[in-house]
Each structure stands twice: as C-alpha cells, then as structure tokens.
Amino acid sequence: MKIVDNFIFFWGGWLSNFHPCRIVFGSKVFKSSEQLFMYLKALHFGDVETAEKILLAETPKEAKTLGREVRNFDEKSWNEVKIQKMYLALEGKFSQNKDLMDKLKDPALDGKFFVEASPFDRIWGIGYDQDHALQNQSNWGENLLGKTLTFYRGSL
C-alpha cells in the first residue's frame, strides 16, 4: 500500500480480495473475499455445482479460476450486479475481521480514494502499477474494486 496525495494505491496485501480472512455468509465459511465473490457469481447464474466447487477451493486463485467457468454466464446480467456482489464480499471481509476493519478505519486514510494498482486488470483495477499510476491517470481502467472499497469505507 502506498499513499500519494489523495490516493491509496494497493495491489496485494490486506486490501486485496486474495488476502486470507474468515468470512461466514449464510451457513457457509469462506477463506477470502475472492472466494465469496466467486461463489456469489456462480449462484447468480444458478450454477450450484460450480458454487460448491468454489466452496471447496483451497486458494483465492483456485476460486477465481472456477469463477471463470461459471455456466450460463451473461456479461450484461453480471455487469448489473457485480458491484453489489463485491460490496457484500467486502462487507463480510471487514465486518467479520476486526484487525482488517481497524486498518480500514485508520484516520490516516480519511478523505482518500482507494486505487487497485494492478497492471493486469483494467476492470477491477487501473491497469497500472503504483509506480506508473499517477503519470497515466487519464488512461486508468475502471478501478471497480477501489471504488467499491472507497464507497464501503465511506458507509462506516
């Protein structure tokens, strides 16, 4: 994590969806917000079989891979709900893990905007690493994870 001006650049670490944390959602237990997010994706499309496989995933990477195999996937439908599903995953992550919530509520982060500085993801991130982000700000990707984190923190 690197704070520059009003931006909190992150990729990996405790803000990442791959960060290990215990989340209980319904009667199910998840090992990361990525696993919960992919589970919610599978359920959205009625793919219970893949949802069950995601539940058994040992790593966030495995859950993400399974999430790409969801049957009946429809991009238009997913685009309408994916931010809501991400919000639920983040809410579970932070509300159920006091250590992470304490970090998120750090006053040093007040008034700042979260930016996922992933050079590989222009949807959930900006498509640039933190060292090249500012000089390319006009070309950033959507940063949906950063925006959702910023919104979630603002709701606390």
Regions found by a protein language model. Name each.
Residues 1-156:
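Charged, low-complexity intrinsically disordered segments
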